Curated annotation (Swiss-Prot):
One of its GO terms (cellular component) is cytosol. It comes from the Eukaryota. Disruption phenotype: Abnormal sexual reproduction; decreases MFalpha1 expression and abolishes hyphal elongation. Decreases virulence in a mouse intranasal inhalation model for pulmonary infection. Normal vegetative cell population growth at high temperature. This is Post-transcriptional regulator MKT1. Belongs to the XPG/RAD2 endonuclease family. Coiled coil: none annotated. Pfam families: MKT1_C (PF12246), MKT1_N (PF12247), XPG_N (PF00752). Keywords: Cytoplasm, Translation regulation. Involved in 3'-UTR mediated RNA regulation. Complexes with PBP1 to promote mRNA interactions with poly(A)-binding protein. InterPro entries: MKT1_C (IPR022039), MKT1_H3TH (IPR037314), MKT1_N (IPR022040), PIN-like_dom_sf (IPR029060), XPG/Rad2 (IPR006084), XPG_DNA_repair_N (IPR006085). The gene is MKT1. SUPFAM superfamilies: PIN domain-like. Interacts with PBP1. One of its GO terms (molecular function) is nuclease activity.
Length: 768
């Protein structure tokens, strides 16, 4: 975020300078990842507003980043990306109406209405009216970007808190780790004299100098900091002045007249008056957050910026640091955990839940009543839920005081003006703590791993290998190894034991290391899957969704609810339920797409289901992070290592899936019925000329209308192979549960199993 109104002011006053990109040759450029990604996500040449309708992540953004990296390489510029870290301490969100969320919903509803009327281009234009067409949380892109950086040997670091502060440290460091900064104008609030604000990375870049801005506004450097806070930035909102119109000149005049920002807060009447005290407090916190920004030094310590970079040769000692920085940033965590954040092993968002004492749940792209129950009970507040277990794992490796901390949850659907404390995560529950205690049972050494890799003829440590290593009593016995004084040393040991611990925490493996009922279904599905089909994570997600009771063929909201756009087009109620179940299942599988915005039909029906998939996938990824950090910081793994990025990238659930595969499958099934006189193909029609013609026409339709998909016909066949693997898991569950299972032994209800069998019978004659 930039200082409010400053960019336009700089343009008007012609304070933005331009320079050839070749000027930066043979330098190291520090790049503010937040500013860079915001540009990609909102620029007309690279934004993908249809993410609001397809879910997932922008399809072309990684390709665009690669293109920029190649351009920098051609000009001999070495980029160093810095990502934002932990959130600053803040009050809970206000409980009144969320105006931004209401505006977003209005825009999306209007866009869907236009799409329903056949005005697809107008619908896209409508989506651009909200947030410049950006519907992506940058944190969801982090893993994909880090994977790219790792493969291209691009340097990156996650700041402990504010990314700009970390850039300022790298710039001012005596060793000169970077020579220039690419960021927003907000960067000038720190001890930075000039900043590159934009570039095409091929020809020119634009930059601004602080001294020219100070001369133009007639402010000192300290006054400019106050000016930036009062005008509004990522650290503070704009001061609520009586005047209805905001302008940069008015704010600068006030600071100049009153000499300082705090004097402005104390002497200028604010509207409404009762909020003046709160704004003054937030002003002070924002000012101290800049002046005493916490940064991670090259020695691995998290310290205030002035203690390592003395501004303007001023004398500065540790005694000058305020004693209440915890009220501005967060309670202190070990430097080792800051370092794990820095290297990307654990996301700042996850640790931020614990340090801030808050989880703020944002609304999905399309929600249902079932989703509210799911995100509350299954994902967050249940004693065995992923988020609850994640927080318990982190608290377990920190000082005991952290276990006494209350973690409040604020949902987007909370009633307006509800109690500020809200719901909470019961991470100290006895059931949750029992799961944490069982993690230390997994200490399988490298020798056993190598034996298992040879036995399974595999070269990869993954979910399939780990669940397969428990397929018999003899194999299970090998995984019981007394800990003794051993620690897990190699990367593969850490990854494999993290996977096993995860599987036990999620109930796929029992305490005796044998498969649980749901673990047997997972293993059965893996045994019939091709390695190249990449079904491991989707099958796991399917089983989790089945256990949560949200994967079925019924309409959202019940049988009497109105159908959503993009659902089944033909057939009676049972046939439509079958199509819904098939398209939902297949939509969990990632589609191999081209590096361009989505081209093809859209589906509200699948977008609603995608909210469940993404919510689950992200929470499981966060749980994996907590499991791996718990393994290392509890002393079970070697702590002094340099392969954190390799560990991070070896764990599952790196990215989010969109609705594309479900749309592809649904479109084929609809087209087949359409060309078969609006009727599905039955077993009696298999091999007839009419049935074969209908399938050929449907395949032709797929090839012509899904140009953003690589090899759509082959992908369609892969999707139906995935359905076959899911059916193996379903039948395994049905067999293991028996005809009349007890509630504790029930993963999926008999009615849902019957839905799958009916859908499979309906689908077989329809397949290509």
């Amino acid at each position: 975020m930039t200082i409010r109104g400053l960019d336009n002011y700089l343009k008007e006053r012609k304070l933005i300078q331009s320079c050839p990109i070749s000027t930066l040759a043979n330098t190291r450029l520090g790049i503010d990842a937040t500013h860079y990604l915001n540009h990609l996500l909102t620029d007309p040449n690279s934004r993908e507003p249809l993410v609001a309708a397809t879910g997932g992540l922008p399809l072309a953004i990684i390709s665009k980043i690669e293109s920029d990296l190649r351009a920098l390489e051609r000009h001999a510029i070495k980029p160093v990306f810095v990502f934002a870290g932990l959130p600053l301490a803040s009050r809970p969100p206000p409980k009144g109406p969320d105006i931004k969320a209401e505006r977003e919903n209005q825009i999306k509803n209007e866009a869907w209405a236009l799409y329903d009327e056949g005005q697809a281009y107008s619908a896209v234009d409508k989506l651009v009216q909200f947030n410049n067409g950006n519907f992506v949380d940058q944190r969801d892109l982090l893993r994909s970007i880090m994977r790219l950086f790792r493969h291209r040997y691009v340097e990156f670091v996650v700041a402990p808190y504010l990314g700009i502060a970390q850039l300022a440290y790298l710039l001012q460091h005596p060793k000169g780790y970077i020579h220039a900064i690419y960021s927003s104008s907000e960067c000038l609030m720190w001890p930075v004299e000039r900043v590159i604000t934009s570039s095409d990375w091929n020809n020119n870049f634009q930059f601004v100098e602080k001294v020219r801005i100070l001369n133009d506004l007639n402010l000192t450097s300290e006054q400019f900091l106050d000016f930036g806070i009062l005008a509004g930035s990522s650290l503070s909102r704009t001061i609520p002045l009586p005047q209805s119109e905001f302008s940069i000149k008015n704010i600068a005049d006030l600071v100049r007249h009153h000499k300082s920002g705090i004097s402005v807060c104390q002497n200028v009447r604010q509207e409404p008056p009762y909020k003046a005290q709160f704004y003054t407090e937030s002003f002070w916190k924002a000012r101290l957050a800049v002046k005493f920004s916490l940064v991670l030094t090259t020695e691995g310590a998290c310290v205030p910026l002035p203690t390592v970079i003395t501004p303007q040769q001023q004398a500065f000692t540790v005694q000058d640091v305020p004693g209440d920085l915890e009220e501005i940033f967060s309670p202190r965590i070990p430097d080792e955990l800051y370092f794990h954040i820095c290297r990307g092993l654990v996301s700042a968002q996850v640790v931020g839940w614990l340090t801030s004492g808050m989880i703020i749940e944002q609304q999905p792209l399309l929600e249902t009543g079932e989703y509210r129950r799911f995100i509350k009970d299954v994902i967050t507040e249940g004693p065995t839920s992923p988020r609850c277990t994640t927080i318990a794992l982190l608290a377990d490796i920190l000082h005991p005081d952290w276990s006494k901390r209350r973690i409040n949850v604020h949902y987007y659907f909370d009633p307006p003006y509800a109690p500020v404390r809200g719901a909470f995560v019961p991470f100290t529950d006895a059931l949750t703590q029992s799961l944490i205690g069982r993690c230390s049972d997994w200490m399988v050494p490298m020798f056993n791993l190598e034996m298992e890799l040879r036995r399974q003829n595999s070269s990869t440590i993954d979910l399939k290998l780990c669940i397969g290593a428990l397929a018999s009593e003899e194999l299970v016995h090998r995984t019981f190894k007394p800990k003794g004084d051993r620690v897990l040393d190699k990367k593969d040991e850490v990854v494999a034991n993290s996977l096993w611990r995860f599987l036990e925490v999620r109930g796929f493996v029992q305490q005796n290391h044998a498969h649980s009922l749901i673990g047997k279904a997972l293993y059965a599905a893996y045994t019939v899957s091709r390695v190249n089909d990449r079904f491991q994570e989707p099958i796991y997600l399917i089983l989790e969704l089945l256990r949560a009771g949200v994967l079925h063929g019924g309409k959202w909201g019940g049988p009497e609810a109105a159908p959503l756009l993009g659902g089944p087009s033909f057939g009676d109620e049972d046939e439509q339920n079958s199509v819904r179940l098939i398209m939902r299942c297949i939509s969990v599988l990632p589609l191999v797409s081209r590096n361009q915005q989505w081209v093809g039909p859209l589906s509200q029906e699948l977008l609603a289901f995608n909210a469940f998939v993404r919510g689950l996938s992200k929470s499981l990824r966060q749980l994996f992070e907590a499991v791996s950090v718990h393994l290392l910081l509890s002393g079970d793994g070697r702590r002094n290592r340099d392969d954190y990025s390799d560990i991070m990238l070896s764990l599952p659930f790196q990215t989010d899936v969109n609705t594309g595969f479900g749309i592809l499958a649904k479109s084929y099934l609809d087209a087949t019925s359409y060309h078969n006189q609006l009727e599905p193909i039955t077993e009696e029609m298999i091999g007839t000329e009419g049935a074969e013609t209908a399938k050929r026409q449907a395949i032709l339709f797929i090839e012509e209308n899904f140009s953003s998909v690589k090899a759509p016909v082959q992908e369609l066949e892969r999707g139906f192979r995935f359905w076959d693997a899911v059916m193996v898991a379903i039948r395994c569950l049905a067999e293991e549960q028996g005809p009349n299972p007890k509630l504790a032994q029930t993963v999926v209800g008999r009615d849902v199993i019957e839905q799958f069998e009916r859908a499979d019978k309906w689908l077989k004659p329809m397949r290509p």
